[in-house]
Regions:
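Typically the conserved alpha-helix immediately C-terminal to a functionally engaged Cys/Sec
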Residues: 16-30
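Structural micro-motif
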Residues: 52-69
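Non-catalytic, surface beta->alpha helical segment in thiol-disulfide oxidoreductase systems
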Residues: 64-93
Length: 93
């Protein structure tokens, strides 16, 4: 299975609304996300920046949270999305 990352911010309201969707997806499927808080963790910020050339074009030209990233296919899903969209994205990987 592909390695899926979730970049999020501790105080980000969009990230907070996505967490139950992520948890539901992990409970209902074999999908697992490696979660990285980037607002207060410099190592996680560096990790996210290391993918900036791939993430920025897919995320409106900027690095933002929440962002979901597949390290194998280099596909990204950016922002707050409905559960079904997250599920479809994660399972197609």
């Amino acid at each position: 299975m592909a390695k899926l990352l979730m970049f999020h911010g501790r105080e980000c309201p969009h990230c907070h609304r996505m967490m139950p969707r992520v948890e539901k997806l992990e409970t209902e499927t074999a999908v697992r996300f490696e979660k990285h808080e980037v607002w207060h963790d410099e190592a996680n910020q560096e990790l996210m920046r290391s993918f900036k050339d791939v993430l920025k074009p897919k995320c409106g030209g900027q690095l933002r949270v929440p962002t979901f990233f597949n390290t194998e296919t280099k596909d990204a899903l950016c922002g707050e999305v409905e559960y079904e969209k997250l599920k479809d994205w994660a399972l197609k990987q």
